[in-house]
Amino acid sequence: MASVFKIHSAYQPAGDQVKAIQNIADSFQKGEKKVTLVGVTGSGKTFTMAQVIQNLGLPTLVLSHNKTLAAQLFREFKEFFPENAVEYFVSYYDYYQPEAYVPSSDTFIEKDSSINEEIDKLRLRATSSLLEREDVVIVSSVSCIYGLGSPEEYTNSVVALKVGDTIERDTVIRKLLHIQYNRNDLDFSRGNFRVRGDSIEIYPAYHTDGIRIEFFGDEIDSISRINPVTAQTIFKLEKAYIYPAKHFITSGPKVKEAVENIRAEVDAQTDFFRKNNKLLEAERILSRTNYDMEMLQEMGYCNGIENYSRHLTGRKPGERPACLIDYFQGEFLLIVDESHVTIPQIGGMFAGDRARKQTLVDFGFRLPSALDNRPLNFQEFETLTPRTLYVSATPAEYEIEKSSKVVEQIIRPTGLLDPIVDVRPTKNQIEDLLVEIRKRIDAGERVLVTTLTKKMSEDLTDYYEEIGLKVAYLHSEVETLDRVGIIRDLRKGIYDVLIGINLLREGLDIPEVSLVAILDADKEGFLRNYKSLIQTIGRAARNVNGTAILYADKTTDSMAKAIEETKRRRKIQEDHNLKFGITPLTIKKEVGDIIEREEKERTSEDLVLEDVEKKFNSKKFPNKEVLKEKLREEMMKAAKELDFERAAILRDKMLSIQTEDSSAKN
């Protein structure tokens, strides 16, 4: 039977990929539940994953341990499966301060957050795709184990409309309001709808196009997909399914029942506090909960509504909440990327969440039922994901022990060797590194530098900036979409050097990087253990000139083991290349936005950039010297007119051309 997935790629499986794909697919088809793929950096693990997905033909959840790598995988899978639904599901918070109480200082910290609308749209699109089709690949962070609205409520709330259906216009309006759409006849934006005579125009919360429903009396006369900006018809539809604008949907009767149960719980908790002479806590929980219940009854919503999710969804005490995994219908495949990091992260989520909320419960800020608004614990996660492929260059003991088969993928189809590892003393490491960076810049290549502390990263970035290097600092406070933008800018040559702490290890795919520098490599610990060193060294394995410099005054056991393993893998690849006459080549990969941003959400900078690309390109100016001069003139003109944003973009364009020239010369 033909697979519902179809890979689009100019390449065929090669090297160890052929055997790995066959072994993994055969294992799952025989009924085996857990398999581990041990694949070195640059061996094409993502391509192997895609081939396994195509062979099995199952909906797939790809789990990554951070948003940056999830975004990279999302882009790669979209390229492999352009005809299928590839979706992205990560936390939609740009900023999140959870509710907390610090007893030692009697400080209550209110929840504060900022939601990224683009990621919210992608999350909603992910769940709608799971309910609509079978050919779905969802790339997710650990957000997939956190509470989400019930899939049953979500499915039951879908508004199904078909040409020829008899239904009153006002009934459709009421249904849209129930699934959290807002009527706004002036602002036609995501999650809103407007009414124009005998038609309703809806802007789905998960889509880039709008939908127009036209009525003739009480009958649906036509349904169209429309451009939300111009309102012009794109094409006609026979039917349309409008999915809720929010994941948390609750019917009126359930709210009434939930309020009764919450009031019963608050009475019991108040009695408990009073019996234990905790009068302040008793008054606190009573007043806070009463206020929330009034809001819930009047508005259907209250701040911190997620803390009442157990009652609103009718779950029993201790019962796990619904999550993204529950939206998969029937059999599916879970792929855990960089499993040696992702698996421990899943295990740690529950304990951290529980500790914070227990304090809130103990001091009367939340009811005990708030503890059930939580991520899955590890046992629940294992139960929900029976068919799992673990993928890592350095799998942990857990993955190896759980797997019925461990498949190695050492040989790279490109012939690329593992990087040369050079150990140097820490004395004058910054100046020594500067010399190496300049060599790479002259060759048109890029550099990653990893430090031990945030302060050292910041100081090093400032120092290199002062002496004229194009350098960026990648850290945890950079927003998700900006983080992937920095990586794109490094690849394009806007930056030559990227400095970070622990964000430069697993999975970062930058073929232009020929040097990875690890400062203080002999400081044994989480960031300098064997697995971390192997992963960091591997960042230079996608370039034919790949080198890793470890600055250290002694060789630790972790360093010795990592260097030995790198040499072993290098020898295997060298022998393969010699046997088949393969010449190593740097991976060629198109530079593009990892996550496409929508037309309406482009910033002024995007528009200026588009204008510059349109007016100043190699087609209009084939001679690069003429193009650079035109860019310089336009840059000076923009600066004179105080349009510094345009001037900066023109400067970056000019620098990018200069970088291309120096690369070509070398």
From Swiss-Prot:
Residue ranges constituting the UVR domain according to the UniProt record: 625-660
GO biological process, one term: SOS response
SMART domains associated with the record: DEXDc, HELICc
Compartments, as annotated in UniProt: Cytoplasm
InterPro entries: Helicase/UvrB_N, Helicase_ATP-bd, Helicase_C-like, P-loop_NTPase, UVR_dom, UVR_dom_sf, UvrB, UvrB_inter
UniProt KW keywords: ATP-binding, Cytoplasm, DNA damage, DNA excision, DNA repair, Excision nuclease, Nucleotide-binding, SOS response
Cross-referenced HAMAP family: UvrB
Note on domains (UniProt): The beta-hairpin motif is involved in DNA binding.
Family statement drawn from the similarity comment of this UniProt entry: Belongs to the UvrB family.
Protein name as it appears in the record: UvrABC system protein B
Source organism per UniProt: Leptospira interrogans serogroup Icterohaemorrhagiae serovar Lai (strain 56601)
Gene name in the database record: uvrB
